[in-house]
């Protein structure tokens, strides 16, 4: 099985005749609410501790590929919702998502030009930076260091980046015309 698709830039892999449909605000909201539902869905034991942050991944996607459509306010609000849902220190996720958004905005032009392998590395770095912020807040509030496995969800999230990339784009691709020659 060839992994050449990991090396070539996304822009050069796309069909030159493929033009994605315009993104509607309700689709962005639907993807963010779906990500919130995936974050809140209860999983048994070990799976709960390695679940990636789907909100963070979805925010990264929208900021990288449509930087003018999603801003800091939705990220901050979703962070507060996650803080309440997790029972964590209020503002912890919100601050982490704000930093995540800043890094994604800062790197979005660079990420778009890279192949999927390099995109995965950038997404992993952004997710780990976000988790470091949350860990710092926890440590300052008196919690103990959870160990290096704490960063496992970021690595798993980065590994899921190609899947998320393709799943979000499915409705944005135009339907094939049955009358086309």
Where are these regions (language model features)?
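Terminal, non-globular segments
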Residues: 1-181
